[in-house]
Amino acid sequence: INTLTRMQVPIAFQELYRPHRYKVYWGGRGGAKSTAFADALISQGMVRPLRILCTREKQNSIKESVHALIKNRIEFYKLEGWHITNQDIRHENGTRFFFMGLWNNIDSIKSVDGVDVCWVEEANTVSDQSWQKLIPTIRKGGSEIWASFNPELKSDAVYQRFVLHPPKEAVVVKVSWRDNPWFGQELMAE
């Protein structure tokens, strides 16, 4: 059995597998946003070579990124063809996940080229200034910007930009623990 056919795709996250310039998933803790994003990017990266930039506003080390989650999901599914280092994650077909913080790299991020998908994790912390520089950087034809976040303030730049005033090319989905097929008793107790 092909491992990709065994990956469970929660109904709320099916739009991750359809082309949209912006894919924005928001909601409370336990909504499976990060896990669903990682699975979708891994599976799509196995089908065709992708350059995937994983970012957040502040990232002082790789440990503060989604690197560990992506690594764990690859190991969970026992996927072959992946090479995992402390800096990046590569597939034998050319797919590459790489990780950068925005706040301390925003000017160097402008020179990053050829990104197919940019995943902005904890997007509620990303400043409007960072969004203004990041969006035009992800300019490859057919490229996408994915954002996942737990809302904090309605004044957060991501909430204003994508939830209250979504661009026409955006799919914006609010999710909760009810959309999470992996929701465990530990989270329920909280």
Where are these regions (language model features)?
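Short, flexible loop motifs at catalytic/binding sites
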Residues: I1-E190
